[in-house]
Amino acid sequence: MISKLSVNPTFSPSYNIIVDSVLDFSHILEYVTNKQVLVVTNTTVAKLYLTKFLAALVDDLDVRTCILEDGEQYKSQQSLDKILSTLLENHFTRNSTVLVALGGGVIGDITGFAAAIYQRGIDFIQIPTTLLSQVDSSVGGKTAINHQLGKNMIGAFYQPKVVYTSIEFYKTLSQREYIAGMAEVVKYAFISKDFYLWLDSNRDKILAKDSVTLIEMVKRSCQIKAQVVAMDEKELTGARAILNFGHTFGHAIEKCQNYRGLKHGEAVGVGMAQAIDFSHYLGLISQQQAKDFNDFIVSFGISIDFPNDICQKEFLEAMLLDKKNSNKELKFILIENIGSLSLQKQSKNELEQFLDISR
């Protein structure tokens, strides 16, 4: 069973997202029109899927691999340099090269950024292997590496040629990784009331990993993101900002833990709860709404407990570095109801007072 949908960005060419019930890498062959292929993956995914992927490629291609260490802390300049050096050392050229990102969000982000900057832009293909990367980072063209002072601070908007994925990847995905991915899925429920109701009525099947339900879940999640990206590909109008619900707080958590604590999806889960509580603090929603929204997050196995190893001063400093901020104004994605999120400016003083009472 294959589900296919199209992403139509504002400025870039359209591309397909292919969600498969089985794992059949041959579906991407029609998109590999280049003769030089560099497969970027990590040590974990390489052991599981690299051999099968390489076997699916035709014989007349010049195929090389670049295997990075696994973990958010390796979404770095050093890893980027390794990819670029591999391309240069093997004389890969702009018009004959395609990069393939075989892995989760870190691999997709760093490979996409390498594609964006190598010889001013080469083709790349996304093969996301985690639930989180399937529904979020592989769609929409955000590519980046981290800086020691902040997450995703060095990057570009650059769209893939195609996204291919399969729910069969879940067989080798830990329960922790699966639940981390569910946080990004739940994020879309706060953006779309229809999806909120669908998730609510299909919770048991989702937690039981029913294959038909999961394909529909991934498809619906990608559709919501694709619709937003079509309106505001490069975050010029502010429409795309709602996709960052939970991320302002979440990114700060990751930064404070040096990307070695909570996984990205876990941090987003906590971040959404923080954004919900901040919305209540500001009077945008009632106490009962805040409880209902947080209970909805928790009902999918997602923890909303704030880590106890984070210093409030350091956390506040990390939030001040958020990319949405401008002219020293703090900007947050806040909630007024299901399907009603908005980008709002708040003062540093308001945030400090909220953090004081919420810790």
Curated annotation (Swiss-Prot):
Q: Name one GO biological process term.
A: amino acid biosynthetic process
The protein's annotated pathway: Metabolic intermediate biosynthesis; chorismate biosynthesis; chorismate from D-erythrose 4-phosphate and phosphoenolpyruvate: step 2/7
What EC number(s) does its UniProt record assign? Answer: 4.2.3.4
In the record, what terms sit under GO molecular function?
A: 3-dehydroquinate synthase activity; metal ion binding; nucleotide binding
- Give me the Gene Ontology terms describing cellular component: cytoplasm
Question: Where would you find this protein in the cell?
Answer: Cytoplasm
Co-factor: note = Binds 1 divalent metal cation per subunit. Can use either Co(2+) or Zn(2+).
Q: Which residues bind Zn(2+)?
A: 184, 247, 264
Task: Name the domain of life.
Answer: Bacteria
Ordered alphabetically, the record's keywords are:
Amino-acid biosynthesis, Aromatic amino acid biosynthesis, Cobalt, Cytoplasm, Lyase, Metal-binding, NAD, Nucleotide-binding, Zinc
Q: Which Pfam families match?
A: DHQ_synthase, DHQS_C
Write out the residues that bind NAD(+): 70-75, 105-109, 129-130, 142, 151, 169-172
Chief localization: cytoplasm
Query: Which cofactors is this protein said to need?
Result: Co(2+); Zn(2+); NAD(+)
What reaction does this enzyme carry out catalytically?
A: 7-phospho-2-dehydro-3-deoxy-D-arabino-heptonate = 3-dehydroquinate + phosphate
What InterPro entries does the record point to? Dehydroquinate_synthase (IPR050071), DHQ_synth_AroB (IPR016037), DHQ_synth_fam (IPR030963), DHQS/DOIS_N (IPR030960), DHQS_C (IPR056179)
Family annotation (HAMAP family): DHQ_synthase
- Explain the purpose of this protein: Catalyzes the conversion of 3-deoxy-D-arabino-heptulosonate 7-phosphate (DAHP) to dehydroquinate (DHQ).
Q: Which family does it belong to?
A: Belongs to the sugar phosphate cyclases superfamily. Dehydroquinate synthase family.
Protein name stated in the entry? 3-dehydroquinate synthase
Could you tell me the gene encoding this protein?
aroB
